[in-house]
Regions:
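Radical SAM enzyme [4Fe-4S]-AdoMet core and its adjacent flexible, acidic
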Residues: 22-147, 155
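Flexible mid-to-C-terminal extensions adjoining Fe-S/redox cofactors in radical SAM and related proteins
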Residues: 141-170
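Residues at the C-termini of beta-strands that transition into short coil/loop
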Residues: 13-16, 83, 163
Length: 170
């Protein structure tokens, strides 16, 4: 949180995959302190939160709705829902398709636009309104792991370019 207060940041991206601290701790494999969501002195207009859809955690409209409200309550202006890329057994077993979320069934969620590059990637944008507060929602519907070669990913052992297995940076 101290790093988030630095005035030179233009944008801060935060992985926030659940609204419940105990479930978030399960996902991360470590204890998340209760004060993890204390953002006093942080310019939250710079913050984007990203939520991976994971079976057993955020995997339906009700859970997604709670995640939207959680972000609004924290004062975070943007949240992204991201489907896991089926790049390993865990991701294949815990994959949740964004279509199964039925985001449009959540009251006061409005579709704004969608962009795609054919079978390589598709993203959609929405707005959510509650009590005169607006939350921007972005969704990565799907992405071809081989298409995303411009992304650098650390898999816990190697730095990779893109999300596929062959491209290790030494």
């Amino acid at each position: 949180q101290e790093m988030m207060r630095h005035p030179r940041w233009d944008s801060i991206s935060m992985s926030l995959h659940h609204y419940d601290v105990s479930k978030l701790s399960e996902l991360y494999g470590c204890r998340i302190p209760e004060k993890a969501f204390d953002f006093e002195g942080i310019d939250l207009q710079k913050v984007n939160s990203s939520c991976n859809l994971v079976k057993g955690y955020i995997d339906n409209a009700e859970e997604s709705h709670k995640m939207l409200d959680f972000n609004l309550d924290l004062g975070i202006p943007r949240v992204g829902f991201v489907a896991l890329m089926k790049v390993n057994d865990y991701c294949r077993e815990h994959f949740v398709d964004l279509e199964d979320i039925h985001l449009d069934s959540i009251p006061h969620v409005y579709f704004t636009k969608s962009m795609n590059r054919g079978s390589d990637c598709k993203c959609s944008n929405y707005l959510y309104n509650r009590d005169l507060k607006i939350l921007e929602i972005y969704m990565r519907n799907y992405a071809n792991p081989n298409y995303c070669e411009s992304s650098l990913v650390y898999d816990g052992e190697y730095l990779r370019q893109g999300f596929h297995q062959d491209n290790i940076i030494y």
